[in-house]
Amino acid sequence: MTSKLCQQLGIEFPLFAFSHCRDVVAAVSKAGGFGVLGATAFNPEQLAIELDWIDAHVDGKPYGLDVLIPENMAVKSEKDLTSKKLAERIPQGHKDFVDQLLKAHGVEGAGDHARARSDDAPPPFWPEEAMELLEVAFKHPIKMIINALGVPPPAMIQMGRNHGVPVAALAGAKEHALRLAAAGVDIIVAQGGE
């Protein structure tokens, strides 16, 4: 089963796996699909390690990278905001609810609200940080970059163009897709509920 997108990306099957796990990304790509590594939890050094590992395990097959750069962000002007400070704003009732839900379903890690980010790291959706991750990614043979939170910034689209790599973005509604197309996004991913 082939399609124009399969031909464009050099894949055998139109199967895409968005994952934060390098093993999943590599396995899907190696099997003929297209693995996409979610990069938001990594700092540039960690991302380089992950991408080196993927490069060594995909036998030259294509894969991509997903970042989160929101169009709008309520905390955009708070330049001294850290991941720890942002996490402290989450009401305890919300944390308790999540803990109870995870425990009720036997999910490990209940009560652990920490991510793979240091306390003094910028919040995970900082545009500047995402652009640094893309710079690291383009030192590797990635074949697509994706923004999962709205219209990618012009600098991201230009970066993709400069490297000959298509830029994709996720759309949850027709209006989103129209805005993405108007911005010059190459591939629009129609997302729905799971």
Report the location of each language-model feature:
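Active-site entrance/lid segments in N-terminal catalytic domains of soluble metabolic enzymes
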Residues: M1-E194
